[in-house]
């Protein structure tokens, strides 16, 4: 049977299942596709198809991720599910699968467990804007008081990590019953998808955000001036717009006097376009790879920040030994490497390969930076870690 093409008439949202191992994330993912397939909103996908997730590489890190897509009455969703806990950690820190929202799966029989906490904390650190809770395996709990207790625990945990625990929708159900086609099982899935539709906000389109373009290359064109090339990360750039060159050196102001793509002149470049931008009165040596062009005032250069980082294991091609305080690797932001020094928290002596950790970094040169910015840690040209800026310190 030929696959039907998804018509992109509905708004698109990226979502993922998170939660403790064996609480039913993959069963729930399968159940959503199977229930929505009945109304033509999905291709029914079996549990073992999702569980045998293919490996992908993101910034030199191998991650197993399963992707399914489905639609509700209101939206089109791309849904990621990871088989292992380490895959989740890597996925969230590298941003390999951008999440506009998450479904936190908690087993009603067990209540919140260590990875439940860790996934909520990570979601907060990496800026997942909203989540909905599916209290799974309720068919295994006979005592309604116990269900209420687990729900209270989950709400307290969400509040503790900065999510609005009191208002987050918690749907009770059983993914297994839904997979077996039982009406109460399917009903809970439909209720969950209604909650996801209404509670998880529609992401802001990249075009609407302020203009930002990381500089990849700089050329001088005789008689015309300096051209910088790169891929527009967000926003729109028009001929005549004032822009700032931010990072590595003092911020400079300039004006865009031309935008071209595939050697053709354009009126504007927008998020996703690979463009060349002609800068008025800027000399070739005043601009370099690693800086960004940005809407004036929208982003500032910083050299001190806190980060949540995943350190590659030896098997993944990372370091063979732990690192300690004052470790000085290269931090690769957008298009360039900058040396920085790592300061570990007082209670941490070292970070082992395969760990995730929170620490402070001090760069030798400032980089255009905002919270949520992703980076790689490199040593001698190979990736040894991946991180996300969680807080700017200066």
Swiss-Prot record:
The keyword GTP-binding applies. One of its GO terms (molecular function) is translation elongation factor activity. Its main location: cytoplasm. Coiled coil: none annotated. It comes from Rickettsia rhipicephali. SUPFAM superfamilies: EF-Tu/eEF-1alpha/eIF2-gamma C-terminal domain (SSF50465), P-loop containing nucleoside triphosphate hydrolases (SSF52540), Translation proteins (SSF50447). NCBIfam families: EF-Tu (TIGR00485), PRK00049.1 (NF000766), PRK12735.1 (NF009372), PRK12736.1 (NF009373), small_GTP (TIGR00231). It is an enzyme of class 3 (hydrolase). It comes from the Bacteria. Mg(2+) binds at residue 26. Keywords: Cytoplasm, Elongation factor, GTP-binding, Hydrolase, Magnesium, Metal-binding, Nucleotide-binding, Protein biosynthesis. This is Elongation factor Tu.
């Amino acid at each position: 049977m030929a696959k039907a093409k998804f018509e992109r008439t509905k708004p698109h949202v990226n979502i993922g299942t998170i939660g403790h191992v064996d609480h039913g994330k993959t069963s729930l993912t399968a159940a959503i596709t199977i229930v929505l397939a009945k109304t033509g909103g999905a291709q029914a996908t079996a549990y073992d198809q999702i569980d045998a997730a293919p490996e992908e590489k993101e910034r030199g890190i191998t991650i197993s991720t399963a992707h399914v897509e489905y639609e509700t009455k209101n939206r089109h969703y791309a849904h990621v599910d990871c088989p292992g806990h380490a895959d989740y950690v890597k996925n969230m820190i590298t941003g390999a699968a951008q999440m506009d929202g998450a479904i936190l799966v908690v087993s009603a029989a067990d209540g919140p467990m260590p990875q439940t906490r860790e996934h909520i904390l990570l979601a907060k650190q990496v800026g997942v804007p909203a989540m909905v809770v599916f209290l799974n395996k309720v068919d295994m709990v006979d005592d309604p008081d116990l269900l209420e207790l687990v729900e209270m625990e989950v709400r307290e945990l969400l509040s503790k990590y900065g999510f609005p625990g009191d208002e987050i929708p918690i749907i009770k159900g059983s993914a297994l019953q839904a997979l077996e086609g039982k009406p109460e099982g399917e009903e809970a899935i439909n209720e969950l998808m209604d909650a996801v539709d209404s509670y998880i906000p529609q992401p802001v389109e990249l075009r609407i955000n302020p203009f930002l373009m990381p500089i990849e290359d700089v050329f001088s064109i005789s008689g015309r001036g300096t051209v910088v090339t790169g891929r527009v990360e967000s926003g729109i750039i028009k001929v005549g717009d004032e822009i700032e060159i931010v990072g590595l050196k003092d911020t400079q102001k300039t004006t865009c006097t031309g935008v071209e793509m595939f050697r053709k002149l354009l009126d504007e470049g927008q998020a996703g376009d690979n463009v060349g931008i002609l800068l008025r009165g800027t000399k070739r040596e005043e601009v370099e790879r690693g800086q960004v062009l940005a809407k004036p005032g929208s982003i500032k250069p910083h050299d001190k920040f806190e980060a949540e980082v995943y350190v590659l294991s030896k098997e993944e091609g990372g370091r063979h030994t732990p690192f300690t305080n004052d470790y000085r690797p290269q931090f690769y932001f957008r298009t360039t490497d900058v040396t920085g020094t790592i300061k570990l928290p007082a209670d941490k002596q070292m970070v082992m390969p395969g760990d995730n950790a929170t620490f402070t970094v001090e760069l030798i040169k400032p980089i255009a930076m905002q919270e949520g910015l992703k980076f790689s840690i490199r040593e001698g040209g190979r990736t040894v870690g991946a991180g996300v800026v969680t807080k700017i310190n200066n």
